[in-house]
Every structure is written in C-alpha cells, then in structure tokens.
C-alpha cells in the first residue's frame, strides 16, 4: 500500500520556512513560562504551588490532546491541524495579555499548550512530506534546531521589554500578532496532499495495535524520559547552582551599568539561555553533518556526551558546572529528533496517530521535572539533578540498541 504521507518527493521550501517559523513561536511560548513564572507569582501574589500550575497546565495539554490531534491529522490532513494550533496559540496569547487575574492566565497557558501540541503533532510528520523522505531526520533536526532559538530568545526579550517600561505580558501580545500573520499565510497556502485514504483511517483497534508495538513503546518511553530530563535539567540549573555552589543570583559576568547586565543579570541566567542556544546551534550543525555521517553514529555520540556532561555538571566545581550545564544543552541537540524520526521511519502509514502517541509522552516534562524538584527538596539538589542521569542513559541505550530506523535506506 502506498504511503499518502510520502507520495511526492518535491521540495516545498516555502511551507518548510512557514513550518519553521511556527516552531520558533512554539519554542518561545514553551520557554517563556520559566522566564515569567516568578513575575506571575509576584504580580498576582500567589503561592509557589499556584505558580507551578503554569508549566503543569502547559504539559497537561500534551497528555490530553496529542492523540486526538494525531487522529485528526490522519483523517483531515496537516493543514487543518496546523491552522487549529496556530489559532489556539494566538487566542491563548491574547487572553494572557488582556487577563486581569491568575486563573485566566493559567487557562490561557493551557490553551497555548493545546495549540503548541497541535503544531508539533502535525508538524513533525508533515516535515517528511516537504522533502525527500531520506532527508527527514536531517530536516526535522534543522527545523527543530532553528525553532529552538525561540527557547533561547525568551530570557532575552522579556527583560528588554521590561527595561523599556513594558509589562512582561507584552511578549504574549507580540507572539499573538505573529501567530495571526502565520494563520493568514497558512490559510491561503497550497499544501501537498497528506490525508490518509479511506482504508487507512484509524480506529480504536488500530490505535491499540500501535500502542502495543515494541518500537512505539520503547521509543515512546524514550520521548517521555528525554523531555522529562531536558526539563528537569534546564528548570533547576539556577536552583542547583544556588544550593550546591552558593552562587547568588545577583552575581554577573558584567558591570551593573552595562546592557548585558540588564539582559543577563546573573551568571546562572546566562547559562540557562546558553543551554537552549547551544542546543539550537547543535541541531543545525548536526543537520549539516547528517549529509556525511550516519544519523545513528551522530545519535550515539551526542547521547553519550549528554550523560558525561551532566555528570560533570553534578560533580564539578562552580566553573565546571556552569560550562557543563551549557554543554549538556548542546549535546541533547539530536536526541528528540532522532527518537521521533526513528519511529516515523519504521512505519509506512499512520504517521499522524504515531505522532500523537509520541506527543502524549511529552507529558514526561511535567512528571520527571516534578520528581527532580521533589527529590531535591528532600535530599538536596545533587540527588535531585541525578534523577536525570538514568533518563539520559535510557536514551543512550536507544541510540545503541534501539530497533527504529533512523534512515529510510536502512535495512
């Protein structure tokens, strides 16, 4: 049976650019939560427990809507799902900007989370349609790599806006404007046919069959643990450095009168930004290297180095920890895309549903992150940060022994 997701190997460069821009926006919307959570807590005078509902609401959206969006994509195609996701991101961002109470902000973040889920669930397999299938892993790595710039930009944009007298919510207004522009572009864009045929449309029995498939199970667990560890590391770098190395948040690399001090007033804030920036750079470098080196070899090397860098960050002195945390971000650059594309390349159909199943596993970002914080509260942040090590070790094991196909030319 022919796969409707790969009928044409024609390259759709314009749609690839638009999809990449969507990924930049959802990167901003994902990482900005960690930047504004303390501002949210202060402005609305809520407890840390209430403030923690922001990331929980965001990742809960993945768990609740990934599979429905995957089914919708297989039935109606990528365009409808991408339009829905972009519209929800715009609506949620506008609601957040105009909200005057904390409940509305939490609801807006949940709506944004649903929109981001839709874009990622449809976008990840859709990228395979936009170029030759043999370039899928490299293209997905490149698009997510450029999109990861959004993760690095939010720690920059919010302080700059506030230094110019704007509210921290202004970033949501700017994002909403961009989303509306993308919505108009996508509405009138011509999409390649990517709908499943009538005989390929999924039912619950097919969903159950996919859910039990060994590759979906093992790699789905890999997504769960990887995203959880990524969140568990990046969200607790500042807490770890404060507790373990007594690094005050006010300590900076620059003088107080400089512009860089206003943007990155602390060393730890800079390292968090570098974690995401180096991850983005690493994805673009890896995308280029995949033209010449086996995707699996690149995956093995980077996943092994991720574990080594994190161990150095946990065990090293202040300087070693700062550098190693930034390098951990760099070496995680291919893990998500390699795990995801290995599953997609292993099946000739049902890519929307598979994307939905894998997207559901992203809820690990909330659960593993919570576990890191809980262990850190009870036994200290060295133990808390160490929770991420076995998660990254599992990803390394997948890179070596996993049965998924990283290259469509693999036997």
What are these regions (language model features)?
Residues 33-34, 213-273:
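Extracytoplasmic gate region of multi-pass secondary transporters
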Residues 14-46, 124, 233-241:
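Extracytoplasmic
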Residues 134, 139-191:
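Helix-loop-helix hairpin linking two adjacent transmembrane segments in secondary transporters
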Residues 31, 59-67, 152, 276-284, ...:
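Residue-level signature of mid-helix packing/kink "hotspots" within the transmembrane helices
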Residues 108-145:
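Cytoplasmic helix-loop-helix junction between adjacent transmembrane helices
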Residues 45, 77, 98-103, 315-317, ...:
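Helix-breaking motifs and short loop linkers at transmembrane-helix boundaries and internal kinks
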């Amino acid at each position: 049976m022919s796969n409707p997701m790969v009928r044409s190997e024609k390259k759709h460069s314009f749609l690839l650019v638009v999809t990449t821009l969507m990924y930049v926006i959802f990167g901003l919307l994902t990482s900005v939560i960690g930047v504004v959570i303390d501002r949210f807590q202060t402005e609305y005078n809520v407890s840390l427990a209430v403030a923690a509902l922001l990331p929980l609401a965001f990742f809960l959206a993945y768990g609740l809507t990934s599979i429905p969006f995957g089914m919708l994509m297989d039935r109606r195609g990528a365009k409808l799902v991408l339009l829905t996701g972009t519209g929800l991101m715009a609506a949620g961002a506008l609601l957040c900007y105009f909200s005057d109470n904390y409940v509305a902000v939490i609801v807006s973040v949940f709506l944004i989370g649903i929109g981001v889920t839709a874009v990622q669930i449809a976008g990840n397999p859709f990228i395979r349609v936009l170029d030759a299938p043999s370039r899928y892993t490299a293209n997905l790595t490149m698009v997510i790599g450029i999109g990861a710039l959004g993760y690095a930009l939010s720690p920059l944009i919010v302080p700059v806006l506030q230094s110019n007298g704007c509210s921290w919510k202004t970033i949501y207004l700017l994002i909403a404007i961009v989303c509306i522009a993308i919505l108009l572009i996508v509405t009138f864009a011509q999409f390649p046919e990517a709908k499943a045929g009538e005989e390929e449309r999924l039912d619950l029995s097919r969903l159950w069959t996919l859910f039990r498939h060994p590759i979906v199970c093992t790699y789905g667990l890999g997504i769960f643990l990887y995203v959880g560890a990524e969140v568990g590391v990046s969200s607790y770098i500042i807490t770890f450095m404060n507790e373990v190395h007594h690094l005050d948040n006010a300590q900076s690399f620059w003088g107080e009168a400089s512009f860089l001090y206003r943007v990155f007033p602390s060393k730890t804030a800079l390292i968090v930004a570098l974690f995401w920036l180096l991850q983005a750079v690493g994805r673009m470098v890896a995308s280029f290297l995949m033209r010449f080196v086996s995707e699996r070899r690149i995956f093995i090397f980077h996943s092994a180095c991720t574990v080594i860098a994190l161990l150095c960050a946990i065990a090293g002195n202040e300087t070693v920890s700062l550098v190693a945390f930034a390098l951990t971000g760099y070496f995680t650059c291919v893990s998500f895309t390699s795990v995801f594309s290995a599953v997609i390349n292993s099946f000739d159909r049902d890519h929307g549903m598979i994307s939905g199943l894998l997207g559901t596993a992203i809820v690990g970002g909330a659960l593993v992150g919570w576990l890191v914080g809980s262990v850190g509260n009870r036994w200290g942040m060295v133990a808390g940060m160490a929770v991420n090590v076995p998660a990254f070790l599992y990803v390394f094991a997948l890179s070596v022994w996993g049965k998924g196909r990283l290259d469509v030319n693999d036997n």
